[in-house]
From Swiss-Prot:
UniProt topology in membrane: Single-pass type III membrane protein
Annotated lipid attachment (S-palmitoyl cysteine): 50
Purpose: Forms a proton-selective ion channel that is necessary for the efficient release of the viral genome during virus entry. After attaching to the cell surface, the virion enters the cell by endocytosis. Acidification of the endosome triggers M2 ion channel activity.
Keyword Lipoprotein assigned: yes
Gene that specifies this protein: M
Cellular localization per UniProt: Virion membrane; Host apical cell membrane
Coiled coil: none
The protein's name: Matrix protein 2
Modified residues (Phosphoserine): 64, 82, 93
Length: 97
């Protein structure tokens, strides 16, 4: 019996090595799941920057404005713009001698 390959059983019980029975539905399902897992893992490693950038930044598109009146939307835009404009004067100019 080899410990590193597959489990072998005595031939006299007519079990043999059951790893070669590829017609078993469980073996077929496990093979398909294994192949799909390998493909998804390879795609994840190849495109992980694109995938995780999409989930990190792509789904954050600001607060929902559904059901909010247009006047309140305009007020919110003005507040956001005034906050951006106020930050423009906070830059420090450093001159080296």
């Amino acid at each position: 019996m080899s410990l590193l390959t597959e489990v072998e059983t005595p031939i006299r019980n007519e079990w043999g090595c059951r790893c070669n029975d590829s017609s078993d539905p469980l073996v077929v399902a496990a093979s398909i799941i294994g192949i799909l897992h390998l493909i998804l893992w390879i795609l994840d490693r190849l495109f992980f920057k694109c995938i995780y950038r999409f989930f990190k930044h792509g789904l954050k598109r600001g607060p929902s404005t559904e059901g909010v009146p247009e006047s309140m939307r305009e007020e919110y835009r003005n507040e956001q713009q005034s906050a951006v404009d106020a930050d423009d004067g906070h830059f420090v100019s450093i001159e080296l001698e």
